[in-house]
Every structure is written in C-alpha cells, then in structure tokens.
C-alpha cells in the first residue's frame, strides 16, 4: 500500500469510529420500526382473516 492509500484508510477508519455510535443508535431505531411494522401487518392479517 502506498502512503496515500494508508492516509485514506486511516481517514476512513477515523470516520467509521466517529459514526459507530450514531450507526448503532440508528440500527436500533430501524430494527424497532421494522419489528413494529411486521407486528402491525401480522395483526392486520389476523384481524382481516377474522372479519372477512
């Protein structure tokens, strides 16, 4: 690896380290929203099946 590639890699790792907590928080929120959406769809299916 050249020194330029090393510098780019170091900068990239620095950015990743800075973003890691934000990404973790966002992942938790997205996971929660996805689970909520799936549960809503399942409940809607069940209720739809009952009423139809």
Swiss-Prot record:
Keyword terms of this UniProt record: Host membrane, Membrane, Transmembrane, Transmembrane helix
Q: Which membrane topology describes this protein?
A: Multi-pass membrane protein
Any GO CC annotation of this UniProt entry: membrane
- Is Nuclease one of the keywords UniProt gives this record? no
Quote the subcellular location field of this record.
Host membrane
What coarse category fits the chief subcellular location reported for this protein? host cell
**Which residue spans traverse the membrane?**
11-31, 32-52
Query: Could you tell me what this protein is called?
Result: Transmembrane protein ORF52
What organism does this protein naturally occur in? Acidianus filamentous virus 1 (isolate United States/Yellowstone) (AFV-1)
């Amino acid at each position: 690896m050249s020194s330029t590639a090393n510098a780019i890699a170091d900068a990239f790792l620095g950015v990743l380290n800075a973003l890691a907590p934000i990404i973790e928080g966002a992942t938790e929120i997205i996971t929660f929203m996805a689970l909520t959406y799936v549960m809503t769809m399942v409940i809607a299916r069940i209720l739809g099946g009952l009423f139809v």
